[in-house]
Swiss-Prot record:
Provenance organism: Desulfotalea psychrophila (strain LSv54 / DSM 12343)
Domain of life assignment: Bacteria
GO molecular function, one term: NADP binding
The protein's name: Gamma-glutamyl phosphate reductase
Location of this chain's protein in the cell: Cytoplasm
Catalytic activity: L-glutamate 5-semialdehyde + phosphate + NADP(+) = L-glutamyl 5-phosphate + NADPH + H(+)
Length: 418
C-alpha cells in the first residue's frame, strides 16, 4: 500500500470503531482504562527501554534539557499516567446525559443530549504521556482516536499504543479505537489533514510551527493548543509576602511546560520593594532574567531584553521583566504579547482583581496563585487532552465534556408540522 492508502485505511477503521464505541457502556469503557493502568505498571521496564531509545537519539541530536524532560518516561511520569487514568475512571460519563427539556406548545418535548464527537486526530510533539492521557479521555467520551506523535518520541508512542490496543482487545472492544500513525515524515500529517470524511476534529499540541502548519493545511476543524506565554502582574496593592512564592513556583517548578510563567509585570509604585529581592531569589535558582530599561537598575541579575524576548515562550529557566505604570499598561502588554493561555494577578484590591478577571482575555485568569494551576488535573477535569487557546468549541483545559457535542432529542406523539 502507498502512504496515502495506508493513512486513508486508518481513517476508515477509526470511523468504524467510533460507531462501535457509541454503544459502549460506561463500565466497559472504565474496564478498558483500568486494564491500561495495570499494563502500564506491569510493562514499565519495556516502556522505559523503548523510551531510552528516544532519549538517546534526542541527546545525539542535541535536544535541549527542556525537550528531554518532556520526552522522558520516568517512574514518576508513569505513576502520574496511572493516576490520571484512575481520575478519568472516577469522572462521570458525559455521553447520554440530557441537558434540560422543554415542552413546546404543540406538545413536543425538546432536549439536548451529550454525544461523542466521533474520530479525533491528535498531532503532538515530545511528550509521550500525551498518548495515554489523550486516548483515555477520548475513549471515556466515546471517541476513536488517531495519534500522530513527534519523530523524537516514536519508540515511546508505539510502545504506549501497544498497551492501549492490548487493553482494548482483552476487553473485546474494537482495537482500532486507538491507532498510531507510525510514519514520521510530514507528508503523513498532510494526508491525514485531508480526511474530512473520516476525522471529525484535529487537535495539534506542540510548538508554534506545528500549530500553524496544521491550521493552514487542514480541511477538518482544528482545536488549537497554542503556545503558553503566561504572565503574572504584580499590582501596586499586592501582598508582598505572596509574590516570591507564586512567581518562583510558576517559573521554576517545571519550566518546560505550557503553563509555566514567561513574564512578570511589576507596578512602578512597588518595583523598588519587590524586584531586588525577587531577582536575587530567581537568580539563585538559575533563572535568567531579561528586562526593560526601567528594571535594570534594580538588579545586576537582569540583562536588557530585546523586542524578540517579549512574547517568547522560553520553556526554560528564563523570564522577562517589565515595569508598568498602571493596570491599563499591564492589560495592554498582555493583550499584545500574551497567547490567551494563562494570566495571573497578585493583588489585595478586590476591584482591580475583578477588572483583571473580566477584562484580560485568556483561557484561565488566576488571582493570587500560580499559573501552574491551569491544568486539567488541578481543575478537577482529570487528565486533559490539551489547553485550548481558541474559543470554539472549547477554551482552556479540555476534559471529557469538551470531547463531546450535543444533539437535539425531540419526543412527540404523532405531531406533524402545519
Amino acid at each position: 500500500m502507498t502512504l496515502e492508502e495506508t493513512i486513508v485505511e486508518v481513517g476508515v477503521r477509526a470511523k468504524a470503531a467510533a460507531a462501535d464505541l457509541m454503544s459502549l457502556a460506561t463500565r466497559q469503557k472504565d474496564a478498558v482504562l483500568s486494564q491500561v493502568g495495570e499494563l502500564l505498571v506491569a510493562e514499565k521496564a519495556f516502556l522505559q527501554e523503548e523510551n531510552e531509545k528516544d532519549l538517546a537519539a534526542g541527546r545525539e541530536k542535541g535536544l535541549s534539557d527542556a525537550m528531554l524532560d518532556r520526552l522522558a518516561l520516568t517512574d514518576s511520569v508513569i505513576e502520574s499516567m496511572v493516576k490520571g487514568l484512575k481520575e478519568v475512571i472516577a469522572l462521570p460519563d458525559p455521553v447520554g446525559r440530557t441537558l434540560g427539556s422543554v415542552k413546546r406548545p404543540n406538545g413536543l418535548s425538546v432536549g439536548r443530549m451529550c454525544v461523542p464527537l466521533g474520530v479525533i486526530a491528535m498531532i503532538y510533539e515530545s511528550r509521550p504521556n500525551v498518548t495515554i492521557d489523550a486516548a483515555a479521555l477520548c475513549l471515556k467520551a466515546g471517541n476513536a482516536i488517531i495519534l500522530r506523535g513527534g519523530s523524537e518520541a516514536i519508540h515511546s508512542n508505539l510502545a504506549l499504543a501497544s498497551i492501549l490496543r492490548r487493553a482494548l482487545e482483552e476487553a473485546e472492544v474494537n482495537p482500532d479505537s486507538v491507532q498510531v500513525i507510525p510514519m514520521i515524515d510530514r507528508e503523513a500529517i498532510t494526508i491525514m489533514l485531508g480526511l474530512e470524511d473520516s476525522i471529525d476534529l484535529v487537535i495539534p499540541r506542540g510548538g508554534e510551527g506545528l500549530i500553524r502548519f496544521v491550521s493552514k493545511n487542514s480541511s477538518i476543524p482544528v482545536l488549537k493548543h497554542y503556545k503558553g506565554v503566561c504572565h503574572a502582574y504584580i499590582d501596586k496593592d499586592a501582598d508582598l509576602a505572596k509574590v516570591a512564592p507564586i512567581v518562583i513556583n510558576a517559573k521554576t517548578q517545571r519550566p518546560g511546560v505550557c503553563n509555566a510563567l514567561e513574564g512578570i509585570l511589576i507596578h512602578e509604585d512597588i518595583v523598588a520593594d519587590v524586584l531586588p529581592g525577587l531577582a536575587t531569589e530567581l537568580a539563585e535558582l538559575g533563572v535568567e532574567m531579561r528586562g526593560c530599561s526601567q528594571s535594570l537598575p534594580f538588579s545586576e541579575h537582569i540583562v536588557a531584553a530585546s523586542e524578540e524576548d517579549w512574547g517568547t515562550e522560553f520553556l526554560r529557566l528564563c523570564l522577562c521583566v517589565k515595569v508598568v505604570r498602571s493596570f491599563e499598561d499591564a492589560k495592554s502588554y498582555i493583550r499584545k504579547y500574551g497567547s490567551q493561555h494563562t494570566e495571573a494577578i497578585i493583588t489585595e484590591n478586590y476591584t482591580t482583581a475583578h477588572r483583571f478577571v473580566a477584562e484580560v482575555d485568556a483561557s484561565a485568569v488566576v488571582v493570587n496563585a500560580s499559573t501552574r494551576f491551569n491544568d486539567g488535573g488541578e481543575l478537577g477535569l482529570g487528565a486533559e487532552i490539551g489547553i485550548s487557546t481558541t474559543k470554539l468549541h472549547a477554551y482552556g483545559p479540555m476534559g471529557l465534556e469538551e470531547l463531546t457535542t450535543k444533539k437535539f432529542v425531540i419526543l412527540g406523539d404523532g405531531q406533524i408540522r402545519s
